Amino acid sequence: MAKKVEAYIKLQVAAGKANPSPPVGPALGQKGVNIMEFCKAFNAQTQGMEPGSPVPVVISVYSDRSFTFTMKTPPASFLLKKAAGLKSGSARPNTQKVGKVTRAQLEEIATIKMADLTAGDMDAAVRTIAGSARAMGLETEGV
């Protein structure tokens, strides 16, 4: 018989930097999950990623307190800020533009995010990422 899923926990943890302190410890501790086991497994899987990049993770906690987790790609906003060389987006995105991204950069980000997007093809994915860029106050060239 398959194990019964008790809960899903959604977290965003920096790659290679999972530790028992908040937000990881309290979220997993409430469900009775072995915190250090998760931290070691997560850090091992994110070893090849850029250290410190935020990685969304969905943890499935089973009735016997075991767990599995799936990692998603970093948020589009993080990738866009990195591509544009910014620390943060615009406070007033419709009036105050803070940077530019090219179509080539948008295609690169869309390629990374394709697994998590519901877009049917690459062009739709690029338009989705371009919309995120405009919402952050970035100008999009060639879209």
UniProtKB/Swiss-Prot annotation:
Keyword rRNA-binding appears in the UniProt entry: yes
Keywords for this protein: Methylation, Ribonucleoprotein, Ribosomal protein, RNA-binding, rRNA-binding
Post-translational changes noted in the entry: One or more lysine residues are methylated.
Pfam family, one: Ribosomal_L11
The keyword Ribonucleoprotein belongs to this UniProt entry's keyword annotation: yes
Record Gene3D superfamilies: Ribosomal protein L11, C-terminal domain, Ribosomal protein L11/L12, N-terminal domain
Gene Ontology cellular-component terms listed: cytosolic large ribosomal subunit
Gene Ontology biological-process entries: translation
Source domain of life: Bacteria
GO molecular function, one term: large ribosomal subunit rRNA binding
Assembly and oligomerization: Part of the ribosomal stalk of the 50S ribosomal subunit. Interacts with L10 and the large rRNA to form the base of the stalk. L10 forms an elongated spine to which L12 dimers bind in a sequential fashion forming a multimeric L10(L12)X complex.
Function: Forms part of the ribosomal stalk which helps the ribosome interact with GTP-bound translation factors.
Protein name (record): Large ribosomal subunit protein uL11
Native species: Saccharophagus degradans (strain 2-40 / ATCC 43961 / DSM 17024)
Record gene name: rplK
